[in-house]
Amino acid sequence: MRKDAKENRQRIEEIAHKLFDEEGVENISMNRIAKELGIGMGTLYRHFKDKSDLCYYVIQRDLDIFITHFKQIKDDYHSNYEVMQVSLDYLLQFKIDHKALLQCIEAGNNKLRFYQSAFYQELFYFYYDLFKSDDDIYTKFKTDMLLQALSTRVFDFQIEHRNISIEAYRNYLLNIYLDEVERND
């Protein structure tokens, strides 16, 4: 990418981040970002496919930091129960702190792109290794189902409409996804 194109892209991300922080992700359109920057929509869409794509790049640095700390959990804790409990606490707090951006990313037109993202893959393999069994298909299924339960949409629904506390949400997931032996380690 040319230097001026990189600078334009960085400027777009910075202004979008500022506007999202000030007015909320849901209140800012791609058109508004282009107007704020004094650029055409074509320039904006040359850098980002859609708002979901832009949100992903805006949050990328935070995702990288999250993944670094997330991986450290396996080194710091030893039982599957502790690893899962601490990782869920960390992940759920991240979801709360970045709710609007994550909603935008997960609601994007290209859902497959999110599931292929480095962030999703890191989460998948983190929990896949935790659930590892002789039945690879079952382990993949179990991991995919956990990640669906951890999607922003499902998490928000449970917290806001079912009135489940975050601690209860975490504990329910621990009960569902870890067997009794692992919970009592």
Curated annotation (Swiss-Prot):
What's the protein name?
Answer: HTH-type transcriptional regulator SAR2658
Is Nuclease among this UniProt entry's keywords? no
DNA-binding span(s):
29-48
Q: Please name the Gene3D superfamilies in this protein's record.
A: Tetracycline Repressor, domain 2
Q: What keywords is this UniProt entry annotated with?
A: DNA-binding, Transcription, Transcription regulation
Q: Name one Pfam family in it.
A: TetR_N
Q: Which GO terms describe its molecular function?
A: DNA binding
Tell me yes or no: is Cytoplasm among this UniProt entry's keywords.
Answer: no
In terms of superkingdom, the source organism counts as: Bacteria
Which SUPFAM superfamilies does the protein's record reference? Homeodomain-like
Q: Which residues form the HTH tetR-type domain?
A: 6-66
